[in-house]
C-alpha cells in the first residue's frame, strides 16, 4: 500500500501563522488603488498588522526597505503610480522584503498589463488575483470584465503554475474555491461567502493580508493559505449576522479581528476547508 502524501500545507502551520501575525504586528506598505485604501487599512488593522500607504515616487523605494512587507495593487494606475510601484518592487526585491502583486483587471487593458508584467521581473513573493487576471498576466487570456473574472479558478491552474515557475513565488487564484500553487504543490481553499463579491475592496484587502502573512511566514504558500483561510472564516462568521452588503462589510472587519489562532485551529479541525 502506498503512503498517503502529506498535505501541502499542514493545518497547524496556518494557526501558527495567525498567532505570529498577532504577535509581530508587521508593517505593510500598501501601494494600492484609490478605491480601496480605507477598507484595506482597516482589514490590516483588524488582523493585527500596521498599514502604511506610502505610495509616492519619492518615498516608495526607501519605505520598501524598512517595511515588513509590500503590497502592489495596480487597480487605479497612472504613470506616477506605475513608477512608484516599480521602484518599490525593485527595492523590496533587493532588500528581500516579501511583496505581493495584485494584477487588478490585467489582460484586457494594455497599459496595466504591461506594467504588471514588468513587475514580475522583481520576483513577487506571491501573485494574487482572480482567474482572468492570472491568465492575462501569464499571457494565456484576454482578461475579464473589468475587475470581475470571466473564468473559473481551475481554468487558471496551469497559468498559475507557469507564473510560479517564472517568479519563484506562490500564485493564488481566487474563485468559488481558491487555488494556490508553489514549488510543485497545489492547495485548494474553500469557503467564504458570496457577499465578499459585493463588498468593494474585499479582494484587494485579501492581497494586503497575504502580504501581512508573508511578513511573518517564510513559506509563501503557507502565507497565502493563511490569509485565504482567515478571510474565509471571517466572511462566514460575518454573514451569519449580517445579511446585506453594507452591514456585512462592517461585520467582516470585526470578524477579521475576532478570528484568532484558536479559531483557525478549531475551524480546520472540522471544516474540511483545505484540499
From Swiss-Prot:
Substrate binds at residues 53, 201. GO terms for biological process: thiamine biosynthetic process; thiamine diphosphate biosynthetic process. GO terms for molecular function: ATP binding; hydroxyethylthiazole kinase activity; magnesium ion binding. SUPFAM superfamilies: Ribokinase-like. Its EC number is 2.7.1.50. Keywords: ATP-binding, Kinase, Magnesium, Metal-binding, Nucleotide-binding, Thiamine biosynthesis, Transferase. It catalyses: 5-(2-hydroxyethyl)-4-methylthiazole + ATP = 4-methyl-5-(2-phosphooxyethyl)-thiazole + ADP + H(+). Its cofactor is Mg(2+). ATP binds at residues 128, 174. Pathway: Cofactor biosynthesis; thiamine diphosphate biosynthesis; 4-methyl-5-(2-phosphoethyl)-thiazole from 5-(2-hydroxyethyl)-4-methylthiazole: step 1/1. Belongs to the Thz kinase family. Catalyzes the phosphorylation of the hydroxyl group of 4-methyl-5-beta-hydroxyethylthiazole (THZ). This is Hydroxyethylthiazole kinase. It comes from Kineococcus radiotolerans (strain ATCC BAA-149 / DSM 14245 / SRS30216).
Amino acid at each position: 500500500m502506498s503512503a498517503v502524501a502529506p498535505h501541502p500545507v499542514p493545518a497547524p502551520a496556518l494557526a501558527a501563522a495567525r498567532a505570529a501575525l498577532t504577535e509581530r504586528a508587521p508593517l505593510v506598505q500598501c501601494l494600492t488603488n484609490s478605491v480601496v485604501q480605507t477598507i484595506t487599512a482597516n482589514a490590516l488593522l483588524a488582523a493585527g498588522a500596521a498599514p502604511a500607504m506610502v505610495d509616492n515616487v519619492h518615498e516608495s523605494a526607501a519605505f520598501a526597505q524598512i517595511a515588513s512587507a509590500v503590497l502592489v495593487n495596480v487597480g487605479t494606475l497612472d504613470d506616477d503610480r506605475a513608477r512608484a510601484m516599480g521602484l518599490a518592487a525593485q527595492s523590496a526585491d533587493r532588500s528581500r522584503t516579501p511583496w505581493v502583486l495584485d494584477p487588478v483587471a490585467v489582460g484586457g487593458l494594455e497599459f496595466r498589463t504591461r506594467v504588471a508584467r514588468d513587475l514580475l521581473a522583481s520576483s513577487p513573493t506571491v501573485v494574487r488575483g482572480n482567474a482572468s487576471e492570472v491568465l492575462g498576466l501569464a499571457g494565456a487570456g484576454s482578461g475579464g470584465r473589468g475587475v470581475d473574472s470571466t473564468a473559473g479558478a481551475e481554468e487558471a491552474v496551469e497559468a498559475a503554475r507557469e507564473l510560479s515557475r517564472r517568479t519563484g513565488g506562490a500564485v493564488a487564484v481566487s474563485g468559488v474555491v481558491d487555488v494556490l500553487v508553489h514549488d510543485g504543490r497545489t492547495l485548494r481553499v474553500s469557503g467564504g461567502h458570496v457577499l465578499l463579491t459585493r463588498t468593494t475592496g474585499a479582494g484587494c484587502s485579501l492581497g494586503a493580508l497575504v502580504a501581512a502573512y508573508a511578513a511573518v511566514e517564510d513559506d509563501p504558500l503557507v502565507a497565502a493559505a493563511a490569509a485565504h483561510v482567515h478571510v474565509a472564516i471571517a466572511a462566514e462568521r460575518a454573514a451569519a449576522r449580517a445579511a446585506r452588503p453594507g452591514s456585512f462589510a462592517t461585520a467582516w472587519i470585526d470578524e477579521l479581528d475576532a478570528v484568532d489562532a484558536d479559531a483557525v485551529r478549531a475551524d480546520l479541525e472540522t471544516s474540511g476547508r483545505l484540499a
